[in-house]
């Protein structure tokens, strides 16, 4: 259900690491990034971790919602935190948000920050419904899915991650002309492995 990506912090994040991250996200798996060999990082200061995380997020902003931990597998450093994060991310990947809560958050977002018009056409996002868990998928109804702006999609993702505490989960947004409404209690049967969406 989830992947632990172990990186050699002494080498930094490489192009192949980003390819692996992309594949993990495509597969709909939760993700935790482990910066290994922290014990032998040269020139380490109190701010080293923050600088490394900042560099990672500048290269891939969506990793803001992925736990990143510094560890030493050799020394057993912070491995208890890894276990805690595994539990949290697993729960987040299987979270049922709740129709009423999602409707409330979505309505507030649309009132405060509606989608801007594009190509002289209004882009109206009508309603949202969670249609799947493992990974969590939120479907949003609109007559013009092709006009939904990429930056607005990122805005919605950011707000949903924050509002619904989905750290590490591979949240997906679908924009559809017709919404399939599902009951919260039925969501467990709709997973990527069941090919139900």
Regions found by a protein language model. Name each.
Residues 5, 11-197:
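C-terminal-of-GTPase-core extension/linker across diverse P-loop GTPases
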Residues 1:
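Conserved acidic residues
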């Amino acid at each position: 259900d989830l992947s632990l990506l172990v990186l050699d912090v002494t080498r930094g994040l490489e192009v192949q690491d980003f390819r692996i991250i992309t594949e993990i996200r495509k597969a709909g798996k939760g993700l935790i990034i482990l910066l290994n060999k922290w014990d032998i990082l040269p020139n380490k200061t109190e701010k080293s971790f923050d600088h490394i995380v900042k560099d990672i997020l500048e290269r891939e902003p969506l990793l803001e919602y992925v736990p990143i931990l510094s560890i030493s597998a050799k020394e057993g450093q912070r491995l208890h935190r890894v276990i805690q994060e595994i539990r949290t991310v697993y729960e987040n990947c299987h979270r049922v948000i709740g129709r009423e809560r999602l409707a409330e958050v979505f309505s507030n977002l649309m009132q405060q920050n509606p989608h801007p018009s594009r190509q002289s056409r209004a882009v109206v996002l009508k309603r949202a419904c969670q249609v799947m868990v493992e990974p969590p998928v939120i479907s949003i109804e609109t007559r013009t899915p092709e006009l939904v702006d990429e930056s607005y999609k990122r805005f919605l993702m950011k707000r949903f991650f924050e509002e619904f505490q989905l750290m590490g989960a591979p949240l997906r947004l679908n924009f559809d002309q017709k919404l399939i409404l599902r009951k919260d209690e039925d969501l467990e049967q709709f997973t990527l492995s069941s090919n139900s969406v």
